[in-house]
Amino acid sequence: ACPVVEPHADGTTSDVRTCVFDAHFFHGKSIVTIEGHARKNADGTLQSLTPVQQAFIEHFSFQCGYCTAGFVAAATVFIDRLKREPVERADLESAIEVALNDHICRCTGYVRYYEAVREVALNTPGCVINEA
């Protein structure tokens, strides 16, 4: 899948499209692919999903899976950013649109992805300020 999460030394993350960068761009860098988001034990057995992954499942966000990696990467980076730079509740919808805007879904029409990300943002302490 195209997007991966790139952790930075300062604790921030970004989603990077592997499909538009040559492999040498990632030489010596740490990246997180879709397989690396969930928590696993030493044997590689799944222990728990991330809040983003769990919300996507609970909202039936994806059908074919084509876009899953991109939405997971973008939403994960977005929630990480909100933890450092929370948004006003009134600005949350537009912030989600900006964060997910570059990703293409061929099946669900995006609504379920947006609903899932909104839920994670609202349920993660410190991501949203001035909640109603």
Placement of each model-derived feature along the sequence:
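Signature of N-terminal electron-transfer/Fe-S-associated modules in redox systems
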Residues: A1-A132
